[in-house]
């Protein structure tokens, strides 16, 4: 008994399913036996088919700056009314939805006008849903690669304005009319819809605004009614953290190394030039990396490229400064003469302004000792010539402190033997040579000090130029924000 009851229930279930399939099949034949998918669903030729459009973004895949290509994954919701597909579910056992292959139904043939890969249509021809009353809905997925003119002026602190332009490839503005869909609250969805639950956030770009608009272009003549475009705009802002960590910070640190060349001695011009040129080479590598990222355009120079060019110019100026300082530091009195004006500026004025004045000279220098030794030699010569003791000579020298003893000494030396005069001449020559060497050494020291003063001035100038220039360049990128447009945010918080 129980087995018979179970068998009866199974038969009823199979019969019900078969009956349901038969009802859908009957509905399909009822609707499509005399249906022509090539004809517009209008009763009169002058009537217009109203197309309701809704674009849902599921993933902003990428923006290729080099190729200026935007890749997006979307769902395109297209709804319209087809009077030829009108039916009542009461006549077909309550079948309220009929799923039909898209090639069996008239389609408005909406394509992406600004695609770049030749794929105008959707990625997958999903089934069309036919509802009671002749309402038709089609929700195909698509992956579009569209053109997007990239503005690289503030790269990597930039934002881009990309568009998705949809148009009916076959029908003009008088044959089909586009309107935006309406949500459950009755609000018009005049923007790209983003389902936060299904949306995958991009790691490089953030979507700020995604408004939509419908624009009708009038034809050039009365016989051409014109076209209608549905334009969705994606205003996206770059997330610069990747470029800050991997390019900007290393570039700033390497560029700052060029200032360390000033901490080398003024005479070490070769080492200073080596440091600066190595920094130049490193900056060239960074500039090459940026050139591989941005599009090949002459319309603008990216912010990061401008910064690299700026620091390369600073490094070049530092190399020139090192050469000039080395040239000044190695000058000698035999090749160059120092003007009093230049000496006053470089040895007195600039060191005092920069706080690098040399320590005051000790009054107890070696000159009096050398002078005393010279006087001692002369007194010894006179003692030998005149056969007088040293005490008497010193006593006489003290009596004639105003120079009378020098005159007497010269008179006595004039009458001395030639050998003694030769010795005195030799001593005078040695003393004169010593004085010349001391003067030359002081002159060389002055040239070195002047080179050091120039080096200090150029260091502070390079430091100020590097700091102010870097700050101004990057502040331009910081203030490059997306303007407050009269659109609601694309993704509601």
Curated annotation (Swiss-Prot):
Localization (cell): Postsynaptic cell membrane; Cell membrane
Glycosylated sites: 86, 161
Annotated Pfam families: Neur_chan_LBD, Neur_chan_memb
Reactions the enzyme catalyzes: K(+)(in) = K(+)(out); Na(+)(in) = Na(+)(out)
Signal peptide span: 1-20
Transmembrane segments: 240-264, 273-291, 307-328, 457-480
The organism's place on the tree of life at top rank: Eukaryota
Biological process terms in GO annotation: regulation of membrane potential
Function: After binding acetylcholine, the AChR responds by an extensive change in conformation that affects all subunits and leads to opening of an ion-conducting channel across the plasma membrane.
Protein name: Acetylcholine receptor subunit epsilon
């Amino acid at each position: 008994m129980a087995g018979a009851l179970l068998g009866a229930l199974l038969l009823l279930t199979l019969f019900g399913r078969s009956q349901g399939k038969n009802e859908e099949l009957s509905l399909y034949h009822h609707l499509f036996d005399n249906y022509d998918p090539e004809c517009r669903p209008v009763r009169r030729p002058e009537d217009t088919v109203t197309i309701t459009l809704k674009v849902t973004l599921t993933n902003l895949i990428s923006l290729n700056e080099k190729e200026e290509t935007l890749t997006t994954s979307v769902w395109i919701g297209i709804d319209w009314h087809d009077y030829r597909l009108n039916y009542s579910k009461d006549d077909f056992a309550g079948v309220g939805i009929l799923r039909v292959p898209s090639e069996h139904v008239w389609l408005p043939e909406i394509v992406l006008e600004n695609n770049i890969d030749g794929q105008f249509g959707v990625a997958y021809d999903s089934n069309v849903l036919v509802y009671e009353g002749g309402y038709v809905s089609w929700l195909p997925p698509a992956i579009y690669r569209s053109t997007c003119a990239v503005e690289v002026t503030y790269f990597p602190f930039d934002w881009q304005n990309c568009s998705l332009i949809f148009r009916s490839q076959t029908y003009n503005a008088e044959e089909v009319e586009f309107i935006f869909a309406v949500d459950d609250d009755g609000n018009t969805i005049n923007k790209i819809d983003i389902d936060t639950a299904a949306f995958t956030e991009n790691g490089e770009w953030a979507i700020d605004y995604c408004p939509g608009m419908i624009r009708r272009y009038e034809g050039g003549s009365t016989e051409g009614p014109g076209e209608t475009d549905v334009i969705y705009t994606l205003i996206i802002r770059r997330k610069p953290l990747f470029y800050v960590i991997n390019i900007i910070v290393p570039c700033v640190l390497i560029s700052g190394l060029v200032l360390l060349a000033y901490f080398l001695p003024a005479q070490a011009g070769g080492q200073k030039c080596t440091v600066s040129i190595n920094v130049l080479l490193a900056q060239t590598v960074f500039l090459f990396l940026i050139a591989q990222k941005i599009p090949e355009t002459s319309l603008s120079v990216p912010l990061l490229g401008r910064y690299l060019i700026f620091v390369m110019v600073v490094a070049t100026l530092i190399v020139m400064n090192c050469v000039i300082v080395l040239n000044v530091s190695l000058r000698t009195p035999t090749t160059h003469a120092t003007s009093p004006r230049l000496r006053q500026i470089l040895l007195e004025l600039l060191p005092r302004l920069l706080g690098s004045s040399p320590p005051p000279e000790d009054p107890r220098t070696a000159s009096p000792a050398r002078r005393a030794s010279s006087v001692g030699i002369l007194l010894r010569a006179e003692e030998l010539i005149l056969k007088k003791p040293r005490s008497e000579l010193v006593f006489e020298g003290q009596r004639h402190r105003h120079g009378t003893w020098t005159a007497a000494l010269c008179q006595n030396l004039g009458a001395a033997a030639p050998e003694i005069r030769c010795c005195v001449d030799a001593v005078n020559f040695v003393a004169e040579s010593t004085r010349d060497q001391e003067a030359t050494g002081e002159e060389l020291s002055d040239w070195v000090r002047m080179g050091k003063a120039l080096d200090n001035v150029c260091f502070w100038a390079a430091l100020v130029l590097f700091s102010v220039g870097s700050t101004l360049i990057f502040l331009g990128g910081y203030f490059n924000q997306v303007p407050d447009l009269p659109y609601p945010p694309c993704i509601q918080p």
